[in-house]
Every structure is written in C-alpha cells, then in structure tokens.
C-alpha cells in the first residue's frame, strides 16, 4: 500500500454532489484526479459543479484564480472504469445501496493496481460487507466526507473488520492532506456521525408530528438552546430527506425499532419533497 506521500493519482467513483466535492478538494490539494461516472452527462454535470464551486471560492478571496484553474485542469472526467488503472487511492461515492457498492468494489478490485487503497464514502453501510466483494479487504477503509465537502472540515475514518492498520493511517493522512480534521470510528451502523445525527433529525420530525412545536420553533429552539448552526429541519433539507430516510432505515434494520423513521419523514420522501435539491422539503426554496 502507498504512503500518503506516494499518492499521485486519486480516483473518485461518482460525480454527484459528494463525488464532485471530493474530486475538487483532492485536485485543489495537488493530486491528479480521475472522476468517473456511468454517463457522460453525469460527468459533465460534476465538472460544472466543481467549476462553479471554485468560482465561488475565488469570488470570496478564499482561492486565487490561478490555483482554481490549475485544480480544474487536474481533474479528468470519464465513463471508463479502466481509467482508474493508475490510481493509488480511490474513493467511491455512489448511491447508498449495498449491492451497487459491492459491484463497484468488485470492479475496482479488478482494474486498480494491487497497491491501491479502496475507500468508500458511505455514511451508514458496513465497510466490512463492502470489502468482502474484493480480494483485498485489508486495503478497504471508510473515508466519510461531510457535505458540502469543500466547506466542511471533518472527515470520518471508518475501520472495517479486516482493514489493515497501515491503511487506516493512510486514510487519516490523506484526509489531513486535504486540510481536513479526522476522527475514527469502528464499523458499527451509522459510525459516529450518523449514529447520533440521524436519530436527532428523526426525533425532531417526530416532535413536529406529535404537535410538540412548529418546525420553526423546533429549529429555533435547537439553535438557540444548544448552539448548533442548523436545526433538524434545516439540516434535513440540506442533507436531503431521502438520504436521511435511507440512513435511518439502515439504523432501524441493524439496531431495532427505536430507530424507526418518523411517519412524516417517509411521507415527505414519498411525495418527492426531498429538500433543497427539489425546491421543497420541510421548507420552500427558490
């Protein structure tokens, strides 16, 4: 396996919100990046998302134009998984579906170099189960970025049953090379972040459904009373109600009925009101 100083090329599988964000911060840190998705349109959308994000950083004087242009030039977009043949570290950021992730990791195992570290950005699914799809489970690790990736400082490193200690060290060092701070979690449902965050959001929705207070007062009470930047409804809309539901259902499946998703959360998702990305969630957006 490579030391972090030996990593030159980073692969990113998935060009959506998370994948494009990961590609952006890796390229900004100086890595060559290969960003792959299944359709050319998705790759183009991801690249446009990165360009827009870099432009915003330049407009805020958080990044100079030369560095922004250089970062974008370091990113190769592709639909060909074989383009990852020279990747030293790959981060998978596809949909939170175990069978899809296992298929991706089986394919990555076949096309990437033997030394490559294979990481998943999963927020709730088992690293150990994902790793079982490969012949190198000791080189599979969770590197869970927070959304939005270019803005959030934290990265959760998740250790599977067979993850080698050296791979864990590489995961921490890689995240730190992106100017992130890390914490470590064992391969238990939800890890640290979503084991605590998703029940918090879910309980907020339950409180609304049971008439404890309005959503505005629940959000206001949590922000003023506990000094968090967003209340549960604002945060749920930001994350995506479908993502919250999927994560909460995973916790329920693994840990029991105390994590059952609130009825109102399920109803919102069924109606297609997923938050900011659809223009409507618990709040309305332009």
Regions found by a protein language model. Give the residues of each.
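Hydrophobic/aromatic beta-strand patches that form the interior of the parallel beta-sheet core
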Residues: 34, 76, 91, 141-143, ...
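ATP-dependent carboxylate/acyl-activation modules
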Residues: 2-17, 22-32, 133, 146, ...
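Rossmann-fold dinucleotide-binding core
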Residues: 42, 117-186, 191-194
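NAD(P)+-binding Rossmann beta1-loop-alpha1 motif at the extreme N-terminus of oxidoreductases
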Residues: 1-56, 60, 70, 111
């Amino acid at each position: 396996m490579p030391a972090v100083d030996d990593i030159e090329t980073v692969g990113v599988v998935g060009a959506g919100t998370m994948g494009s964000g990961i590609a952006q911060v890796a390229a900004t840190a100086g890595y060559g990046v290969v960003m792959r998705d299944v359709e050319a349109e998705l790759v183009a959308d991801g690249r446009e998302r990165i360009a827009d994000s870099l432009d915003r950083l330049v407009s805020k004087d958080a990044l100079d134009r030369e560095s922004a242009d250089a970062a974008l030039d370091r990113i190769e977009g592709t639909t060909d998984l074989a383009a990852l043949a020279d990747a030293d570290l790959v981060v998978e950021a596809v949909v939170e579906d175990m069978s899809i992730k296992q298929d991706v990791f089986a394919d990555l195992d076949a096309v990437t170099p033997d030394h490559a570290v294979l990481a998943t950005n999963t927020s709730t699914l088992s690293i150990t189960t994902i790793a079982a799809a490969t012949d190198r489970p000791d080189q599979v690790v969770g590197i869970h970025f927070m959304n939005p990736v270019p803005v959030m400082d934290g990265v959760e490193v998740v250790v599977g049953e067979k993850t080698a200690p050296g791979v864990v060290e590489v995961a921490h060092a890689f995240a730190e090379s992106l100017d992130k701070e890390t914490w470590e979690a064992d391969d238990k449902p939800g890890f640290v972040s979503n084991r605590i965050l998703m029940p918090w959001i879910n309980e907020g929705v339950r409180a609304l459904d049971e008439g404890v207070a309005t959503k505005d007062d629940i959000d206001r009470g949590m922000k003023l009373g506990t000094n968090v930047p967003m209340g549960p409804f604002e945060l749920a809309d930001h994350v995506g109600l479908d993502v919250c539901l999927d994560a909460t259902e995973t916790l329920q499946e693994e840990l029991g009925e105390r994590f059952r998703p609130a009825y109102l959360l399920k109803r919102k998702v069924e109606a297609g009101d997923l938050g900011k990305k659809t223009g409507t969630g618990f709040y309305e957006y332009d």
